Amino acid sequence: MTLYSRPTCPHCHRVRLVLAEKGIAMEIINIEGSKLPEDLVELNPYNNVPTLVDRELALYDPRIIMEYLEERFPHPPLMPVDPVARARFRLALYRIERDWYSLVDEIEQSPGKPHVRAKKFLRESLLAAADAFAAKPYFLSDEFSLVDCSIAPILWRLPRYEIDLPAQAKALGKYAERIFNRPAFKSSLTELEREMRDAA
């Protein structure tokens, strides 16, 4: 099993976090620069990462990869068993991608630009969801889940994006610290991702 990843990509980070939480041993090929390995170009028509290769199977959407890993390696579980609860979690994953990752992608695609609009909307959207982070130890749950795996890379990058959260977002800050202190989160970080916080 092989994961093609970039060392600073937030989408790759959330897949790496799932791997770390589940203790899955996997070859991770870190791609730096614009040139992609030839085998990746052949496997993935979109030429992007993360891309997971498991024997004859090649997956190249982060959410599909995360759910595949959850089903292939069910322990520890990162999704609830109940179908209604699973549907709620899937909807949360969809909204995180649509509402937050769309803005993150805008910021990440041209890091030299100010991206005032995207940063403003991301900050406001996180603040609007702040109460959801106060209700339980993890997002919508007492247990760590794929939803948290998707949120954590965004929160880790806020200083890099020059997004500061006000005092009233204390619950969000505490939630972030809970996740950042998890051993799996620490081991999911690449050297360049560690430097994002060291430099902030």
PLM region spans:
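GST-like domain detector, emphasizing the conserved glutathione-binding G-site
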Residues: 1-130, 137
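Short, solvent-exposed turn/loop segments enriched in Gly/Ser/Thr/Pro and often Arg
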Residues: 6, 146, 192
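Alpha-helical scaffold segments in carbohydrate-active enzymes
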Residues: 14, 91, 95, 128, ...
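Conserved beta-strand edge residues that scaffold enzyme active sites
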Residues: 33-34, 172, 193
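Hydrophobic/aromatic-lined pockets within catalytic cores
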Residues: 70-74, 97, 134, 159, ...
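Surface-exposed helix-capping loop/turn segments at secondary-structure junctions
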Residues: 131-142, 184-188
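GST superfamily/GST-like fold recognition
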Residues: 139-168, 173-179, 189
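Long hydrophobic alpha-helical segments typical of transmembrane helices together
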Residues: 175-200
